[in-house]
Amino acid sequence: MTVQSKLQGRGKFKKRFFRAGQQVPRPTLELSSVWLSKIFYNPEQHHNKQKMIESGITTRMSGIHENPGQSHHTSAQDYRLLTTDPSQLKDELPGDLQSLSWLTSVDVPRLQQIGGGRPDFTSSAQSSLLERQTAQLNSMTVAGGAGSAIHLQSEMQHSPLAINSMPQFSPGFPCAASVYQTAPQQVLTFTQANQQCSPGGLYGNYNSQNLFPQPRITAHSQDLQPKCFPKPIYSYSCLIAMALKNSKTGSLPVSEIYSFMKEHFPYFKTAPDGWKNSVRHNLSLNKCFEKVENKMSGSSRKGCLWALNPAKIDKMEEEMQKWKRKDLPAIRRSMANPDELDKLITDRPESCRQKSVDPGMTRLPSCPPGQTLPLAAQMQPQPVVTLSLQCLPMHQHLQLQLQNQSRLAPSSPAPAQTPPLHTVPDMTNSSLPQHPAKQHTDFYTVHTDVNSEVDALDPSIMDFAWQGNLWEEMKDDSFNLEALGTLSNSPLRLSDCDLDTSSVTPVSSAGGLPYPDLQVTGLYSSYSAIDALSNQYMNTQGGTKPIVLL
């Protein structure tokens, strides 16, 4: 190739790679060195470099040259890279290629290695060596019977940079002692069981083994994860009522309501604290709950107690049963112990349990002195009340039994539309006989403000019993229904009514015995009969006359 053709090729290279305002791209070391060695080859320099190589590293490279099946010819590229004087390349290079003189910098470390007596191998020699060793490992098979041993010999070879190279397994691969230093042999013994395998198969089987069975790991991880409980479908008012119903006293502080909800519904253990505000709001605003006095407020226990409104207990139980019928599986999933659901709904504290009452009898609750009891609000739509009053101790021989039969008719007018009272004869000026051995005293005193010996509203003296149809009995007894007095809700005094005294025969000349005030609200009353002992003093001609009690 002539110089002109070389220059033409250089011109193409210049047009292709050189651009205005750009630096020369740096090609790889291998391509640049080959390209330069082909263009600038000088036989004289080749002869000088060959002498230097023979004197320096020929003996050390003999191990590679003597390998069978491998020929190593020193190329111009190797000699070019071993140039010791970078100025020679600079002088030989044309002016337009002097910028490529940085390629000669690779000679400095190589010359230092040669001077220090440490051999270096080219990348091509190392790659060919590794390829042969890999092929030998893959082609080698190890055969053995039961109890036979396989001896694998490995030699540790040191590279120029003190890095261990791969072990040699083939005895037919010679290695010069001057280049490689053999380390002590390591004998590895493996016991095989009637199988043929390669070293790659051995390592592959080992790597594919699992130290722990996968199902066991999965089960263990599932045990560590806590069970997730959904939010209960019950409203906060139902949950609060459930907590109060299952308490010993029927009342709890707010903190114990929280504890009950977290114990039976674990969702609230990890839920945000906003649910506690909802509980407090329900306690304050819902009429089903009422605040009660804390009897232990003087001790270390502080805060108020909350209890169920007794009138709302049945309503709350109905609400719980409704949600239970609506979605029972969802409720059971949200509970820590689903078997306790029925117990939580139906149980009541002792203070809230209804006392068993005779189906034929009911008792009127007591009323504080000086107050009237609204009987009309406590009675069923059609009750018949029999009032039995005991006599005072000073009138033990005179038994006066007042049986007042009344009925709250469904068609009765409202208190604001109550018609005026029927007037009856006045008996305030009449006198009743008294026992000969007794001094004159008041005949009957029921007013609670005056006499504390008799409590007209005490259940021990007032007994209310359910009777049959009042109107049929009145017809049989020839009662005059039109004469029944109709009362308003305001208390009525007997002293305000006029009673007929023409049929009453006074026995003594003592002063009249006035009736005291008897207060009862909202009853239709009639005087039906008197005791047999009083027949000698009072004549009941023409049937009984209705009088108004209260």
UniProtKB/Swiss-Prot annotation:
Keywords: Developmental protein, DNA-binding, Neurogenesis, Nucleus, Transcription, Transcription regulation. Disruption phenotype: At 36-48 hpf, mutants exhibit pericardial edema due to dysmorphic hearts that fail to loop and form and atrioventricular (AV) canal. Hearts show continues peristatic pumping rather than coordinated and sequential beating of atrial and ventricular chambers. Endocardial cells remain squamous and AV myocardial cell shape fail to occur. GO terms for biological process: amacrine cell differentiation; atrioventricular canal development; heart looping; heart valve development; positive regulation of DNA-templated transcription; positive regulation of transcription by RNA polymerase II; regulation of DNA-templated transcription; regulation of heart contraction. Residues 402-411 have a biased composition (Low complexity). It comes from the Eukaryota. GO terms for cellular component: nucleus. CDD domains: FH_FOXN4. InterPro entries: Fork_head_dom, FOXN1_4, TF_fork_head_CS_2, WH-like_DNA-bd_sf, WH_DNA-bd_sf. Residues 231-327 bind DNA. This is Forkhead box protein N4. Pfam families: Forkhead. One of its GO terms (molecular function) is cis-regulatory region sequence-specific DNA binding. Coiled coil: none annotated.
